[in-house]
């Protein structure tokens, strides 16, 4: 079983902002996030959209977020 829960995109975005990611630009639902010493990440989810555990684990690899950050 995955250590990652299923959460709403808005909650994940708030958690990413909490660990230092900043909004660089936005075009529709595509948000480009940046953080010092990390490559930019495109966050392409609507706020109310549910993000499953497998996708959340993939996002974590690119952003450095942990289950405790949520």
Which residue stretches match the model-derived regions?
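Basic nucleic-acid-binding interfaces
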Residues: 1-70
């Amino acid at each position: 079983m995955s250590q990652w829960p299923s959460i709403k995109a808005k909650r994940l975005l708030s958690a990413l902002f909490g660990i230092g990611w900043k909004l660089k630009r936005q075009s529709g639902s595509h948000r480009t996030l940046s953080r010092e010493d990390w490559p930019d990440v495109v966050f392409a989810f609507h706020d109310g959209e549910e993000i499953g555990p497998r996708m959340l684990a993939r996002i974590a690899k690119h952003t450095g977020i942990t289950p405790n950050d949520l």
